[in-house]
C-alpha cells in the first residue's frame, strides 16, 4: 500500500466529516452532500472542535484572517457555514449550489480521484484505460478541477488535500493518459496544475514538489 502524506489539520477534517464522507455517493445530490458538511461545521464549532478553523479561516468571508481563538469564540450560523463550503468548492455563494438542483456527484470521476489520492496506481491506470474521458473531465463542483488539479492538493476540498508519496508516478500516469497540463480550474480566480502544486504546503511537506513539477514542466506545463 502506498504511503500518503496527510497533514494533521486535514486528518482532523476527515474525522470531522467522516459520517458525511460515508454517504452513498450513488444517490446523493451535490446540494445535499455539501449541506451535510455545512451542518457538521456548525455542530463542531458549537462543540469546541477547532478543526473547523481550517475551513473558516480560509473560506468564511467574515472570518478569513482571524485567529483560531477569535474564530472559536465568535458566532457561526448555518448560513455562514454554507457560504464557507460553497466558496471552498468554487461556488460564488450557496445560491449557486442550490441552483444545481438535482445534480448528483459523478461516481466514476469521484472514485478516480479517491484512487489517485490513495496512490493506487494500478486502479487509476485501469480506470483511465477503461474510461479515457475521465482524464479531461472536470469536477461537477464549482471549482471545475481535473484529476491533475487535485494532485496539487490546493484549493480543492479540504479533506482531499493530501499527497501520495508516489505522486511522480501518478503525474506520469495522468499525462500519459492525455491530461491537459495547462487546464484552467476555477480556483483562486483561475489556476493551472503547476501553480497549484508549487504553492501548496502538502506536496512540499511530502517532499515531492520539485520532482512532480519537473514532470509537469517536461510535458509543457506553465
What is each stretch, according to the model?
Residues 2-130, 143, 161-163, 182, ...:
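Intrinsically disordered, low-complexity eukaryotic regions enriched in glycine, serine
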Residues 80-84, 146, 169, 192:
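Amphipathic alpha-helical interaction segments
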Residues 97-106, 162-175, 211-217:
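Short alpha-helical "patches" and their helix-cap loops
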Residues 103-114, 204-222:
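Ankyrin-repeat-protein effector appendages
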Residues 105-116, 136-161, 183-203:
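Ankyrin-repeat boundary/"N-cap" motif
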Residues 126-134, 168-180, 213-222:
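Ankyrin repeat domain, specifically the short helix-to-loop turn at the C-terminus of the second helix
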Amino acid at each position: 500500500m502506498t504511503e500518503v502524506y496527510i497533514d494533521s489539520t486535514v486528518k482532523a477534517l476527515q474525522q470531522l466529516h467522516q459520517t458525511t464522507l460515508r454517504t452513498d455517493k450513488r444517490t446523493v445530490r451535490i446540494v445535499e452532500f455539501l449541506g451535510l458538511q455545512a451542518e457538521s461545521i456548525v455542530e463542531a464549532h458549537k462543540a469546541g472542535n477547532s478543526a473547523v478553523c481550517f475551513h473558516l479561516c480560509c473560506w468564511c468571508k467574515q472570518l478569513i484572517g482571524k485567529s483560531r481563538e477569535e474564530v472559536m469564540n465568535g458566532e457561526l450560523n448555518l448560513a455562514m457555514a454554507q457560504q464557507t463550503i460553497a466558496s471552498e468548492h468554487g461556488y460564488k455563494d450557496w445560491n449557486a449550489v442550490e441552483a444545481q438542483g438535482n445534480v448528483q456527484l459523478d461516481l466514476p470521476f469521484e472514485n478516480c480521484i479517491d484512487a489517485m489520492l490513495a496512490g493506487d496506481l494500478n486502479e487509476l491506470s485501469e480506470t483511465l484505460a477503461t474510461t479515457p474521458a475521465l482524464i479531461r473531465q472536470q469536477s461537477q463542483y464549482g471549482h471545475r478541477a481535473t484529476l491533475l488539479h487535485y494532485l496539487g492538493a490546493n484549493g480543492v476540498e479540504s479533506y482531499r488535500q493530501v499527497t501520495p508519496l508516489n505522486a511522480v508516478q501518478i503525474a506520469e500516469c495522468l499525462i500519459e493518459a492525455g491530461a491537459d497540463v495547462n487546464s484552467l480550474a476555477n480556483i483562486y480566480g483561475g489556476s493551472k496544475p503547476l501553480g497549484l502544486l508549487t504553492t501548496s504546503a502538502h506536496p512540499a511537506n511530502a517532499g515531492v514538489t520539485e520532482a512532480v513539477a519537473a514532470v509537469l514542466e517536461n510535458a509543457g506545463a506553465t
